[in-house]
From Swiss-Prot:
[4Fe-4S] cluster binds at C799, C1120, C1123, C1129. GO terms for biological process: double-strand break repair via homologous recombination. Residues 1-284 form the UvrD-like helicase ATP-binding domain. ATP binds at G8, R9, S10, G11, S12, G13, K14, T15. This is ATP-dependent helicase/deoxyribonuclease subunit B. Heterodimer of AddA and AddB. InterPro entries: ADDB_N, DNA_helicase_suAddB, DNA_helicase_UvrD-like_C, P-loop_NTPase, PDDEXK-like_dom_sf, PDDEXK_AddAB-type. The lineage of its organism: Bacteria, Bacillati, Bacillota, Bacilli, Bacillales. Pfam families: ADDB_N, PDDEXK_1, UvrD_C. Despite having conserved helicase domains, this subunit does not have helicase activity. Belongs to the helicase family. AddB/RexB type 1 subfamily.
Length: 1154
C-alpha cells in the first residue's frame, strides 16, 4: 500500500495522466484487479465518457465512482443495505414531522418553523453536522459551555444549538436501525472498507477534488490503509512544506494536500515521490497561458500584444448578454468548426439567468444542458396536487380550487383542452361573481343575468336555465373528485390510508395517462427535456408516497399535519439530471463545475457582488455563530469570511478551463432596470491585457460595423428581431446595410416565412387607430331604434372607442364578489326610494321626521335592500356586515340632512327614482336622425322637486352622489356632463304630464351621500355644530338666478349670508355674490338646447360608425385615467400623444351671453 500525489497547475495534464495510466493498465490486463476512478458527483458522467472515449472497446476492471456510489457498491458487498434508504424528500418529510411534534419545545425556531424553506435549511444544517462529525451530544455540551458566558450572541447561539440538538437527536433516533440517508453512507463506507475484498485489491485514482469534509477524510484514511495503491491528483503549483499566505490562490488545495499527507504519515502509509507537472498542455494560445501563469501576480504582469483569445463582453441587460453569447456560439459553430459540446457557460447566479437562457437558446436553436437540478414545484402535476390539498385544507377557497383547475388535470382525456379552458373561464367568472367557496360548491347553482335591483324578481329565461345546467355540470367536474379526496382524507386513520387517498385521487383522474400524453406532445415538438420531466414526475410522486408510508405509514397524524408534511416533500422534489444529447452546450455552476475538454468558456454575469461573491447569509448559523463555535472547538463548515478567501481559486479555475477561447461577460442592468456594476476583476483583466478584444451587446445592430451585424443573422426565429430593428431604423430615415434587404427578401421568398414577415411589416406601419364602421354594420350593432342613456352620450364624448367597446362590442369587466362604488351608489339610491315610498304611504312629510325616525328608516331600508346587492355580499362576512352598519350610518346622516332641508325649503319631492321611457311615468326623450334612425333616451332621475311661485310651477332636479360634486359648465360645453341638464329638459318638456301644467327651471343640484369628517379648531355650541354639519352636505350645481326662487330653496338664507343648502351667497343688497352658482331662465334654455344639439350630433356620429381612439384631455384630466378599456385600445400616451383631443379652456360667461 502506498500513496502518490500528482500535483500541477490547472491545465498541466493531471487528469490526462490519470486516464492514460488507467487505460494502459486496462489494455495490458483487461481482467486484472479493480481500478476505481473516484471523482466528485458532478464529474462522474464526463469521466465515464472520457474513459470510454479512448482506444478501449470495453472494460470490466475500471469503474467511475463518487463517494456515495462507492458506498453503495461496498455496502452491497459487505452488508449494510438492509436499512431503507431515505431520499432528501424522505428526510424533509421526517424533519417536518419532528418539527411539528416538537414545535412547542423549540425556543428560537418556533415561529420560523412554519415558514417556507425552514425545513430545507434545517436539513442543510443537519447535513453539515454529519459531514463535520458533530453529534447531538457535542451540541449539548457546547450549549452548556455557551450558557456559562451569557452574552447576547452566545445566548442566541445556545438557543440555536438547543433547538437543532433536540431535532437532531429525534432524527437520529428515528433513523437508527431502520433508515439511512445519503450522509450516513460515508460513515458506513468508512466502517466497511476493511471488510471489502474488492477494495483490498483496488487501485484508486482520486481526481477533481479541491477539499474534503471530515467524513470524506475518514473514508480516505481507510482507503490509504486498506487499498494497495492510491493516487491523488490535486491542483497545486508546488508541494509546499509550510502553509502559503492566506491570500495565496492555492491555499485551499495546499491545506487538502497537507491533511492528506498527515493522514498517510499517521497511519504509516508510504508516500511516493510527488509527481509535479510543470508544463501547460491545455492552452493553445499564448495569452491564455499568460493568464494561467500570472493570474494572481502582484503587481499585474501585462500582456502587451493583441489579445484575441480573451474577449470581454459588455451588455446593456442580462437578456442582451445571453443573446450576444448565443450569437457568438452560432458563429463559432458555423464559421470556426466548433461543436456545441466544445462550449461551456459558467454562471454563479444561475437563477437570475435560467429563464432567459431557456428562451434565448430555444430561439437560436442551441442545444444545451443546465448542470443544476430543477425543482419539480412548478410542474403542473405537482401544482395540481398542492392546489388540491390546499383546496381541501381551506374548504375550497377560490384561489386554491382554480390553481388546480388551471393545470388542466380535471378534464377528461376525450375533452378538447381549448374548449374546456373556455368553459373553466366561464366557471371562474361565476365563482368570482357569486363568491363561491366552502359548502356553496356542493349546492345547486342558479343563474340569472343581473338586471339591476329593479329586475331581481324577473322570471328565469330558457337561455338562463340552459346555462345554469351547463354551469352545474362544470361545477361537478371540478368539485366531485375534490369532495371524494376530502372525504377519504378525513376518514383516513393512518398515514398509509392518507397516502392511498392521494394516490386514488390521481388515479381516478387518469393522471398517468394525461402525463403520457403531455410527454408524447413534448417529444413531437422535439422538447426532450420537458418530455423527461413529464416522465419523471409521476414516479417522483409514487416514491414520495412510498417514503411517507415507510416512515409514517402506521402513525396517526391530523389532516393538517399530514398535508404540511406532504407539502414539505413536494418542495424538495427535483428532476434528475440526464443529458439528453452528447452534442450540447454545457451550462454549469461557477462554484461546482468540473469541466474537461472544453475549447471555449463563457464566464457569465461577472458583476460586482457575484464574482467575487458578496458575503452572504450562512444559513441557520451566522458568521458570528461559526466563529464562536470555532472558539469553543466545535468545527463546522467555514464562515463566509473564510470562503471569501477561496474566491480567487474558484475564479482561477473558471478562467483557465478552456483550451482556445475565453469570454468574460457582464450586464449593466437587470430585469427591473436596476443598475449593475462590473466586477472589480474586469478592471484587473483589462490591466493585464490592455489590448483585449471587447464586445458590446444590446445596442441597435445598425450602429455596428457590418462584420458584427452579420452575427445577427442566425435562423428564421432569432434573426427576425434584428431585422425588425433594421427596418425601423430605415423607416426613421437611417441608412442600413444592403445585407438586410437580402435577409428581408429571403423571408419574403420562403414559403414558411413570408406570412411571418408580412405580419412584421404590417406591424411596422401600424397606427393605433380604430377604423370607422360602415353604416350597415353600425346599424346592425346599434339597431334602427337606439335606446340609450344620457351617460352613454357622455361616454362617446369622452372617447368614441370607449363607447364602441361598451355598447357596440358590449365588453365589460369581470364581475367580482365584492362591494364597489357603483354597488354602494345603487344601495343609496334604492334606500332613499324605499324611504320616500314609505313616507308617501304613511303620508308623513320629510320635514316632520325626528332624528330617531331617520335612523330607524335608514336602518330598515338598508336591511331590506342589502340581500339584493351583489349576490348578498353585504351578508357574506363579518367585514361586510360591519360595512353594512357603516352604510346604515351614512344613510342616517343623509336622511337627517334631507329632513333638515325639507324644514328649510319650500320645495317638495314629487318624484323619486322617476323613470322616463316606454312604460314609465314620463315618455322617452326622442330624436329622429338623418337616416331615419330613432334615438330614444331612457333612464331614471334620482329626484324631482316642485315649488309654487308667482310665475308658476318651479321644478328642480337632484342627483345623489357619493361625494360633494359641482356642475362644470366647460364639461357641459364639450359634452362630458350632459346628464343633469338633459334630466331638467325632460321634466320641463313633459311638465304637463308630471304636474299638470307647464313649468319653469329652478335648478340642477347634486346631493352628497357621504360620511364627512368635520374639522373644528375651537369650541362650538350645538347650533354652530349643526351649521357645520349641514355645510358638509351643501348641494353643488346651479339654481335659477332669482332671489325668490332661492328663498324657496332655503328659507333661512338672509342678505349678507351664504346658504347652508345650495351654492348661493346673497349680498347685503339682495343681489347674488360673485361665486354663487346661478343661471338665468334664458341661460337654462340655452343649455338645454345645447344639450339637445350635442345629443343629436353624437347620434349622427354613432350611425356613421365613428369608433376613433380619441380620448379627451383637459388640463391634467384625461378620458384614460379611469377607463376600463385601456388594455383593449392599447392607447399609449407616449406614442399616441397626438391622438388626444385637447379641450381648450372656454370662456363660459361669453358663451352663455350668446
Amino acid at each position: 500500500m502506498s500513496v502518490r500525489f500528482i500535483i500541477g497547475r490547472s491545465g498541466s495534464g493531471k487528469t490526462t495522466m490519470c486516464l492514460k495510466e488507467m487505460i494502459d493498465q486496462l489494455a495490458q490486463k483487461p481482467d486484472g484487479d479493480p481500478i476505481i476512478y473516484l471523482v466528485p458527483e458532478q464529474m462522474t458522467f464526463q469521466s465515464e465518457y472520457a474513459l470510454m472515449n479512448g482506444s478501449l472497446k470495453g472494460m470490466i476492471r475500471a469503474q467511475v465512482f463518487s463517494f456515495t456510489r462507492l458506498a453503495w457498491r461496498i455496502l452491497q458487498e459487505t452488508g449494510g443495505m438492509s436499512r431503507h434508504h431515505l431520499t432528501q424528500t424522505g428526510v424533509h418529510m421526517l424533519l417536518r414531522k419532528i418539527v411539528e411534534q416538537q414545535k412547542e419545545q423549540l425556543t428560537l425556531f418556533r415561529k420560523a418553523a412554519d415558514k417556507r424553506g425552514f425545513i430545507e435549511q434545517l436539513e442543510q444544517m443537519l447535513t453539515e453536522y454529519k459531514r463535520y462529525c458533530v453529534t447531538p451530544a457535542t451540541l449539548k455540551q457546547t450549549e452548556e459551555q455557551l450558557r456559562r458566558h451569557a452574552t447576547a450572541n452566545e445566548t442566541v447561539l445556545a438557543d440555536k444549538l438547543k433547538d437543532t440538538a433536540m431535532i437532531f437527536e429525534q432524527f437520529e433516533q428515528q433513523m437508527a436501525h431502520h433508515y439511512v440517508d445519503s450522509e450516513d453512507y460515508l460513515r458506513l463506507l468508512a466502517e466497511k472498507i476493511r471488510h471489502s475484498s474488492y477494495m483490498k485489491r483496488a487501485r484508486i485514482y482520486m481526481d477533481g477534488f479541491y477539499e474534503f469534509t471530515p467524513q470524506e477524510y475518514m473514508v480516505i484514511e481507510q482507503l490509504f490503509i486498506h487499498c494497495p495503491h492510491v493516487t491523488v491528483a490535486l491542483t497545486l503549483d508546488a508541494p509546499y512544506e509550510q502553509l502559503p499566505d492566506d491570500l495565496h490562490v492555492f491555499r485551499n488545495t495546499w491545506r487538502t494536500y497537507a491533511q492528506l499527507r498527515d493522514i498517510a504519515l499517521q497511519n504509516g502509509v508510504p508516500i511516493e515521490k510527488v509527481e509535479q507537472l510543470r508544463h501547460n498542455v491545455r492552452h493553445k494560445h499564448e495569452e491564455l497561458r499568460h493568464l494561467e501563469a500570472h493570474y494572481d501576480d502582484r503587481p499585474v504582469c501585462k500582456w502587451e500584444k493583441q489579445t484575441e483569445a480573451i474577449i470581454i463582453g459588455e451588455a446593456t441587460t442580462r437578456r442582451a448578454e445571453i443573446e450576444g453569447i448565443a450569437r457568438e456560439i452560432i458563429r463559432l459553430v458555423r464559421d470556426e468548426g466548433y461543436r456545441y459540446r466544445d462550449i461551456a457557460l459558467l454562471i454563479r447566479n444561475v437563477g437570475d439567468y435560467r429563464n432567459v437562457l431557456k428562451t434565448v437558446f430555444a430561439d437560436y436553436r442551441i442545444p444545451y444542458f443546465i448542470d443544476e437540478k430543477e425543482p419539480m414545484l412548478d410542474h403542473p402535476f405537482i401544482e395540481w396536487l398542492r392546489a388540491s390539498m390546499e383546496a381541501v385544507r381551506t374548504n375550497f377557497r377560490y384561489e386554491a380550487v382554480f390553481r388546480a383547475v388551471k393545470t388542466d388535470f380535471f378534464f377528461h382525456l376525450d375533452q378538447p383542452v381549448h374548449d374546456m379552458r373556455m368553459a373553466m373561464d366561464q366557471l371562474e367568472n361565476y365563482v368570482l361573481a357569486f363568491g363561491i367557496q366552502g359548502d356553496k360548491w356542493t349546492e345547486h347553482w342558479t343563474y340569472r343575468k343581473y338586471k339591476g335591483l329593479e329586475g331581481v324578481h324577473a322570471p328565469q329565461t330558457d337561455e338562463e336555465k340552459r346555462y345554469e345546467q351547463q354551469l352545474n355540470e362544470w361545477r361537478k367536474l371540478v368539485i366531485s373528485p375534490l369532495l371524494v379526496l376530502q372525504k377519504r382524507l378525513k376518514q383516513a386513520k393512518t398515514g398509509r390510508e392518507q397516502c392511498e387517498a392521494l394516490y386514488a385521487y390521481a388515479e381516478h383522474l387518469q393522471i398517468p395517462q394525461k402525463l403520457e400524453r403531455l410527454r408524447d406532445e413534448a417529444e413531437e415538438r422535439g422538447d426532450l427535456s420537458v418530455a423527461r420531466h413529464h416522465e419523471q414526475v409521476w414516479q417522483a410522486f409514487i416514491d414520495l408516497l412510498d417514503q411517507y408510508v415507510e416512515i409514517l405509514g402506521d402513525e396517526t397524524l391530523s389532516l393538517e399535519t399530514f398535508l404540511t408534511i406532504i407539502e414539505t416533500g413536494f418542495e424538495s422534489l427535483q428532476f434528475s439530471l440526464v443529458p439528453p444529447a452528447t452534442d450540447q452546450v454545457l451550462i454549469a455552476h461557477f462554484d461546482r463545475s468540473r469541466l474537461s475538454n472544453i475549447r471555449c468558456t463563457f464566464l457569465v454575469g461577472v458583476n460586482e457582488g457575484v464574482i467575487p461573491m458578496r458575503k452572504n447569509d450562512d444559513g441557520m448559523l451566522s458568521e458570528t455563530d461559526r466563529e464562536l463555535l470555532y472558539h469553543y472547538s466545535l468545527h463546522v463548515a467555514p464562515a463566509s469570511r473564510e470562503r471569501m478567501l477561496d474566491e480567487p481559486f474558484l475564479l482561477y479555475l473558471a478562467l483557465v478551463s478552456s483550451s482556445e477561447r475565453l469570454y468574460v461577460t457582464y450586464a449593466l442592468s437587470n430585469e427591473q432596470e436596476k443598475t449593475l456594476l462590473p466586477s472589480m476583476f474586469i478592471k484587473r483583466l483589462t490591466d493585464m491585457f490592455p489590448n483585449v478584444t471587447k464586445m458590446q451587446w444590446g445596442t441597435d445592430p445598425f450602429l455596428l460595423p457590418l462584420q458584427q451585424q452579420l452575427a445577427y443573422v442566425t435562423n428564421d426565429v432569432a434573426t427576425l428581431g434584428p431585422l425588425v430593428q433594421q427596418l425601423e431604423a430605415w423607416k426613421r430615415q437611417y441608412a442600413i446595410e444592403p445585407m438586410w434587404w437580402d435577409v428581408y427578401n429571403a423571408y419574403v421568398q420562403h414559403e414558411q416565412w413570408k406570412e411571418r414577415i408580412a405580419v412584421v411589416v404590417r406591424a411596422l406601419f401600424y397606427e393605433n387607430r380604430a377604423k370607422r364602421l360602415n353604416k350597415q354594420l353600425a346599424k346592425e350593432l346599434y339597431g334602427k331604434k337606439v335606446k340609450a342613456s344620457i351617460s352613454r352620450m357622455e361616454t362617446f364624448n369622452r372617447c368614441p372607442f370607449a363607447h364602441f367597446a361598451a355598447h357596440g362590442l358590449k365588453l365589460k369587466e369581470r364581475t367580482v364578489f365584492q362591494l364597489k362604488a357603483p354597488d354602494m351608489g345603487q344601495l343609496f339610491h334604492q334606500a332613499l326610494k324605499v324611504i320616500a315610498d314609505r313616507l308617501r304611504q304613511e303620508q308623513l312629510p320629510w320635514s316632520q321626521l325626528s332624528k330617531q325616525q331617520c335612523e330607524q328608516l335608514s336602518y330598515e331600508a338598508v336591511e331590506q335592500i342589502a340581500p339584493y346587492i351583489q349576490q348578498e355580499v353585504l351578508l357574506s362576512t363579518h367585514r361586510y356586515r360591519y360595512m353594512k352598519k357603516k352604510l346604515q350610518t351614512i344613510m342616517t346622516k343623509a336622511t337627517t340632512v334631507l329632513s333638515e332641508h325639507a324644514k328649510r325649503s319650500g320645495f317638495v319631492p314629487i318624484g323619486v327614482e322617476l323613470g322616463f321611457g316606454d312604460g314609465e311615468p314620463l315618455p322617452p326623450l326622442t330624436f329622429t336622425l338623418s337616416d331615419g334612425t330613432v334615438l330614444q333616451f331612457v333612464g331614471r332621475i334620482d329626484r324631482v322637486d316642485q315649488a309654487m311661485s308667482e310665475q308658476g310651477v318651479l321644478l328642480r332636479v337632484i342627483d345623489y352622489k357619493s361625494k360633494q360634486k359641482t356642475l362644470d359648465l366647460t364639461e357641459v360645453y364639450y359634452g362630458l356632463a350632459l346628464q343633469m341638464l338633459a334630466y331638467l329638459d325632460i321634466v320641463l318638456e313633459y311638465a304637463e304630464k308630471l304636474v299638470g301644467t307647464s313649468a319653469f327651471p329652478a335648478g340642477v343640484l347634486y346631493f352628497p351621500i357621504h360620511n364627512p369628517m368635520m374639522k373644528v379648531n375651537e369650541w362650538l355650541d350645538e347650533h354652530e355644530l349643526e351649521k357645520k354639519f349641514l355645510e358638509q352636505f351643501k348641494m353643488g350645481g346651479y339654481v335659477l338666478a332669482d332671489e325668490k326662487t332661492v328663498r324657496l330653496m332655503d328659507e333661512h338664507v338672509e342678505p349678507g349670508t351664504s346658504s347652508l343648502i345650495i351654492p348661493v351667497r346673497l349680498n347685503k343688497n339682495g343681489t347674488f355674490a360673485q361665486h354663487s352658482k346661478v343661471l338665468t331662465e334664458q341661460q337654462f334654455t340655452m343649455l338645454r338646447q345645447h344639450v339637445r344639439r350635442f345629443i343629436v350630433d353624437v347620434g349622427e356620429q354613432m350611425i356613421e360608425g365613428v369608433t376613433h381612439i380619441a380620448p379627451y384631455k383637459q388640463k391634467n384630466k384625461t378620458a384614460c385615467q379611469y377607463c376600463e378599456f385601456r388594455d383593449v385600445c392599447q392607447f399609449d400616451e407616449g406614442v399616441d400623444a397626438e391622438q388626444y383631443r385637447v379641450l381648450t379652456p372656454k370662456n363660459i360667461d361669453e358663451w352663455l351671453k350668446g
